[in-house]
């Protein structure tokens, strides 16, 4: 029983590593938005929707990792 519990904790910890990648991805998306806007301010209205889409996709991968972690901890 203790081995199964330890495996759950290790699996949940490994699953949360994906949250770090999501945070880095979001930072890269908004850094690119700031860089593009500073180079050409007239493209702000064109670049912003793409940045929000990139943010949403990066955040979704992080939420999937968090969901898997919770399933490992509290699931069957």
Curated annotation (Swiss-Prot):
GO terms for cellular component: mitochondrial inner membrane; proton-transporting ATP synthase complex; proton-transporting two-sector ATPase complex, proton-transporting domain. PROSITE patterns: ATPASE_C. The modification N-formylmethionine is found at residue 1. One of its GO terms (biological process) is proton motive force-driven ATP synthesis. It is a multi-pass membrane protein. InterPro entries: ATP_synth_F0_csu, ATP_synth_F0_csu_DDCD_BS, ATP_synth_F0_csu_sf, ATPase_proteolipid_c-like_dom, F/V-ATP_Csub_sf. It is found in: Mitochondrion inner membrane. One of its GO terms (molecular function) is proton transmembrane transporter activity. Gene3D superfamilies: F1F0 ATP synthase subunit C. Belongs to the ATPase C chain family. This is ATP synthase subunit 9, mitochondrial.
């Amino acid at each position: 029983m203790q081995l199964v519990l330890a495996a759950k904790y290790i699996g949940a910890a490994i699953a949360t590593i994906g949250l770090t990648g999501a945070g880095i991805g979001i930072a890269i998306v908004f850094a690119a938005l700031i860089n593009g806007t500073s180079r050409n301010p007239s493209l702000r209205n064109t670049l912003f929707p793409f940045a929000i889409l990139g943010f949403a996709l990066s955040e979704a991968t992080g939420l999937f990792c968090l969901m898997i972690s919770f399933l490992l901890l509290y699931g069957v």
